[in-house]
Amino acid sequence: TARENTLIGNSTLILNPDGTIVSYTEQKNIVTDSLQKIGAMNFLTFRAQINDVSKRMGDLRSMPQADGMWARAVAGQSEYKSIHNTYQTLQIGADKRIGNFYVGGTASYTDGDGKLDNGSTDDKNWSFGLYGGWIADDGQYVDIIIKRHKLDTDFDLHTQSGTGVNGRYHTWGTSASVEYGWRLGIADTDYYIEPQAELMIGHLNGVSHTTN
């Protein structure tokens, strides 16, 4: 039997007296498995932040005179397989309306705490971006967002034998989003329908992580 270390899981080989193999079993390393889950959770966080300025853009379409400084705070939780994450996000920005166009910039910070079966994480994510758009008099609009992201995770894990493994996991990402829609008012009411289509593209750099 070979015991689990920080990279390789448990493996058991049973031999006959003549040296022939009876059975071989291998168990996945739980630290490696947890690092993969942390990476997946960071990807989901990155995905959620690609177009998180869309609510602000909706405000600008609904209230033409609402340009200027703005801020938004969000708290929530997410889950992926056996990792559970709670987070708080602070987002700030400023924009300017110029005729049927508007331009703006935004920055956000997210602090999160993750719980796994064999440890925990402390997550810190930053993003910076520019956005702009066009709003036609007949209700058509185009929104564009370009952002840069930084994702950092400090993790404290343990192997099946109880050996502690801690370290840092970090990467950078870039994203862009383009949305087209048409706000169609319903006659004699305050209601409207808004068909829309959005194209999002993002890239996360290769991940770097260090352990003790």
Language-model regions, residue ranges each:
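Extracellular, surface-exposed repeat/solenoid domains
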Residues: 1-26
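Acidic/proline-rich low-complexity IDRs
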Residues: 6-7, 12-14, 144, 194, ...
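Predominantly extracellular/luminal carbohydrate-interaction, adhesion, and secreted-enzyme modules
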Residues: 1, 91, 199-201
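Outer membrane beta-barrel translocator domains of Type V secretion systems
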Residues: 25-196
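Generic preference for hydrophobic/aromatic residues in regular secondary structure cores
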Residues: 1, 11-15, 168, 183, ...
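Aromatic-anchored, glycine/proline-accented short structural segments
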Residues: 191-212
